[in-house]
């Protein structure tokens, strides 16, 4: 298992409030690592990248279509996207080299998912990633 995959498992899934997670390489626009059983299609990668490329107001208004579900965007800025669909959600944090993607499901606390994902993003930014 790679260092990055261990980082995802320990810092995100270890909280028990992140269902699945992935790192997407910004430059290559490809998946780098994922948690076991989590597949992110190329169309989903494009959706997340476009969420940051658009004006944040437009992203908030339009929402996100991720993993075959429509999500209402509750936060969109230069570094973070938060979106929800009923009792599930996706949190995306942008660093210099990666998008950190985390999902949560029913029974999990979205606030814990957000905090863990933002902290991992901050750690990667400090490391120059």
Curated annotation (Swiss-Prot):
Keywords: Cytoplasm, Developmental protein, Differentiation, Lipid-binding, Spermatogenesis. It is found in: Cytoplasm. Disruption phenotype: Homozygous knockout males are infertile, whereas females have normal fertility. Sperm from knockout mice display severe impairment in manchette formation, amorphous sperm head shape and flagellar defects, resulting in reduced sperm motility. Sperm of homozygous knockout males displays a significantly reduced acrosome reaction and decreased viability. GO terms for cellular component: cytoplasm. GO terms for biological process: acrosome assembly; flagellated sperm motility; manchette assembly; sperm flagellum assembly; spermatogenesis. CDD domains: PROF. Expressed in testis, in germ cells in seminiferous tubules (at protein level). Its main location: cytoplasm. Involved in male fertility. Required for manchette development and acrosome biogenesis during spermiogenesis. Binds in vitro to phospholipids, including phosphatidylinositol 3-phosphate (PtdIns(3)P), phosphatidylinositol 4,5-bisphosphate (PtdIns(4,5)P2), phosphatidylinositol 4-phosphate (PtdIns(4)P) and phosphatidic acid (PA). Contrary to other profilin family members, does not bind to actin in vitro. This is Profilin-4. It comes from Mus musculus.
């Amino acid at each position: 298992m790679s260092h990055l995959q261990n980082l995802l498992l320990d810092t995100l899934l270890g909280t028990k409030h992140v269902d699945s997670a992935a790192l997407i390489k910004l430059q290559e626009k490809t998946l780098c690592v994922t948690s076991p059983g989590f597949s992110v299609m190329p169309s989903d990668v494009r959706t997340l990248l476009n969420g940051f490329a658009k004006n944040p107001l437009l992203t908030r208004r339009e929402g996100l279509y991720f993993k075959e579900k429509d999500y209402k965007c509750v936060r969109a800025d230069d570094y973070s996207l938060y979106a929800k669909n009923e009792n599930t959600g996706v949190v995306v944090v942008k660093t210099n080299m990666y998008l950190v993607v985390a999902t949560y499901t029913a029974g999990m606390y979205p606030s814990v998912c957000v905090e863990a994902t933002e902290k991992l993003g901050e750690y990667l930014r400090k490391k120059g990633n």
